[in-house]
């Protein structure tokens, strides 16, 4: 279920809190979902008149592992809302690293999943629209340039123009 496009209607109906549903959700899932809904709520709060869900919010919610989204019974009786053909999860993105800090012009991070240098990564920073990070230059913790980050919990460095929180 995804009600983000209908936040304005939910607030008009008196909803005052939102809960992330599901069992065993990862820190990545919770971080993306919380950041996306925070962005949607802030956008709604700042809107003057007709509100439309920001495109980046929809894109982020489609990056996390999910089944086909629906609105359940919130907008009336659903027609053909139960999906049998595509009942599996959609998993097109993966968490590859968690940022630990920033030193000497580089993001320092702990690897979660492997990737090759040159792969553009999406960076999720609390309270911000996600942005791309170029990994053309990729270093191990000793500062040696590497072609791939491959070992779980490996410490890596990626040159970047600013600190990421």
Regions found by a protein language model. Name each.
Residues 1-165:
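Surface-exposed amphipathic alpha-helical tracts and adjacent flexible/coil segments at the periphery
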């Amino acid at each position: 279920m995804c009600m983000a496009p209908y936040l304005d209607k939910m607030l008009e109906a008196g909803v005052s809190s939102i809960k992330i549903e599901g069992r065993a959700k990862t820190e990545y899932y919770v971080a993306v979902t919380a950041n996306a809904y925070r962005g949607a709520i802030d956008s709604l709060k700042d809107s003057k008149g007709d509100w439309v869900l920001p495109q980046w919010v929809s894109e982020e919610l489609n990056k996390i592992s999910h089944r086909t989204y629906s609105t359940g019974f919130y907008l009336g009786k659903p027609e053909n809302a139960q999906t049998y053909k595509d009942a599996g999860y959609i998993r097109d993105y993966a968490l590859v690293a968690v940022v630990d800090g920033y030193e000497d012009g580089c993001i320092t991070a702990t690897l979660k999943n492997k990737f090759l240098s040159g792969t553009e990564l999406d960076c999720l920073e609390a309270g911000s629209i996600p942005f791309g990070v170029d990994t053309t230059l990729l270093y191990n913790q000793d500062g040696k340039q590497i072609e791939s980050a491959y070992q779980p919990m490996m410490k890596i460095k990626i040159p970047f123009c600013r600190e990421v929180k």
